[in-house]
Regions:
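NAD(P)H-binding glycine-rich loop region in Rossmannoid oxidoreductase-like domains
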Residues: 1-41
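NAD(P)-cofactor binding segment of oxidoreductase domains
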Residues: 19, 33-61
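SDR active-site strand-loop-helix element
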Residues: 19-23, 60-66, 70, 109-111
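Catalytic helix-loop patch of NAD(P)-dependent Rossmann-fold dehydrogenases
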Residues: 40, 44-48, 68-109, 113-115
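Conserved C-terminal active-site "lid" loop/helix of NAD(P)H-dependent oxidoreductases
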Residues: 152, 180-186, 205-247, 251-252
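Mid/C-terminal beta-alpha module of Rossmann-like enzyme folds, strongest
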Residues: 158, 165-217
C-alpha cells in the first residue's frame, strides 16, 4: 500500500464497492525499532487508501487496534479518548484520524488479541502455546497483561456484517473474557487437552527492559499492560454475539 501509483491502478481496474484494509506492520517490536517504515505503511498507506476510496466512491473498513489506548485500565469503550504509548499504537491512531478525514464513507474496527489457525506461516499466541506444550516445553504467561482475546472467525463475522451493510463510525470487536496471558495459556492447555502444569505465571515487566534483555522481555516491555475492549455498544448496534475464549478455542478443534 506504499506504492501509490499501483494502488490507483488497482482501484481503477477493480472499481471496488467496499475495501477492507488489513495491511499493516502489526508487530509492536518491529514498529518500535523501525518507526519510519511503520509510519509509512500504517499511516501514509492508510491515508492513500482512504483518498482512493473517496475518489472511486468505495466504502472503507479499517482494522485498527486496542493499542490506540494507553493500557492503564482496560475494557475501553468506543468513545474513550485514545492515548497510545507505543509507536505502533500511535500509527494506528494517526491512521484512524487520516481515514476519518480523507474517506467519505468509513468504518473503523478496533480489535484485541486475535488467535486461530493461520493461513500463512505467521503464528499467533494460541498456536505458539499449543506447539510449546505439545513439545513438552513450558509457556510463561505474565499475570499483569490483560486483553480480550478473540477467535479470528468471530472477528471475521463482525467485519462481514460491516461489509454487507454500511455502519459509519468506530466499532470494538473482541471476546467477552478479560484475562491475563497466564489465564489464556491455561485455557489453551485445558481445551486442547495439554499439560497445564507447563503454563507458568510470571509477573508483568514494569517499563522498558534493560539493554541486552532476552527478546521476549524486550517485546513484552514495549506493550501496554492493561488493555482489552468493551464491545457492548458494537454488539448492540451490529447485532453481534459475543463469545468466550473457551468457545473460540473449541472451534479451533473442529
Amino acid at each position: 500500500i506504499t506504492d501509490h501509483n499501483r494502488l490507483d491502478q488497482i482501484f481503477l481496474e477493480v472499481r471496488p464497492e467496499v475495501v477492507v484494509l488489513l495491511a499493516a506492520i502489526a508487530d509492536v517490536k518491529t514498529a518500535e525499532t523501525g518507526p519510519e517504515r511503520a509510519t509509512e505503511v500504517n499511516v501514509d498507506g492508510a491515508r492513500q487508501v482512504a483518498r482512493l476510496c473517496t475518489k472511486y466512491h468505495a466504502r472503507l473498513i479499517f482494522l485498527s487496534s486496542e493499542y490506540v489506548f494507553g493500557g492503564n485500565r482496560g475494557n475501553y469503550q468506543e468513545d474513550d479518548s485514545p492515548d497510545p504509548n507505543t509507536h505502533y499504537g500511535r500509527t494506528k491512531w494517526q491512521a484512524e484520524l487520516a481515514i476519518a478525514d480523507e474517506a467519505s464513507q468509513w468504518s473503523i474496527v478496533r480489535t484485541s488479541l486475535v488467535y486461530g489457525w493461520p493461513i500463512t506461516g505467521r503464528r499467533n499466541l494460541a498456536t505458539v502455546i499449543v506447539d510449546r506444550l505439545k513439545n513438552g516445553e513450558s509457556y510463561e504467561g505474565d499475570t499483569g497483561t490483560y486483553r480480550t482475546p478473540i477467535y479470528v472467525e468471530h472477528l471475521t463475522e463482525g467485519i462481514t456484517q460491516l461489509v454487507t451493510s454500511y455502519h459509519p463510525g468506530i466499532f470494538h470487536i473482541a471476546g467477552t473474557d478479560w484475562m491475563n496471558m497466564y489465564q489464556f495459556g491455561h485455557s489453551v492447555a485445558e481445551v486442547f487437552g495439554l499439560d497445564s502444569s507447563l503454563v507458568k505465571p510470571i509477573p508483568v515487566l514494569a517499563g522498558l527492559p534493560p539493554e541486552n534483555s532476552p527478546p521476549e522481555e524486550v517485546e513484552q516491555g514495549l506493550r501496554p499492560d492493561i488493555l482489552g475492549l468493551d464491545c457492548t455498544q458494537t454488539n448492540h448496534k451490529l447485532g453481534l454475539h459475543a463469545f468466550s475464549v473457551v468457545t473460540g478455542l473449541k472451534e479451533m478443534l473442529v
